[in-house]
UniProtKB/Swiss-Prot annotation:
Its EC number is 2.3.1.12. The lineage of its organism: Eukaryota, Viridiplantae, Streptophyta, Embryophyta, Tracheophyta. Its cofactor is (R)-lipoate. It is found in: Mitochondrion matrix. This is 55 kDa dihydrolipoyllysine-residue acetyltransferase component of pyruvate dehydrogenase complex. Forms a 60-polypeptide structural core. The keyword Cell cycle does not apply. One of its GO terms (cellular component) is mitochondrial matrix.
Length: 15
């Protein structure tokens, strides 16, 4: 989802 690009959200790289 769009949240995946934010820190701490999956694809953001962070948990």
């Amino acid at each position: 989802s769009s949240a995946d690009s934010l820190p701490x959200h999956g694809a953001g790289x962070m948990p």
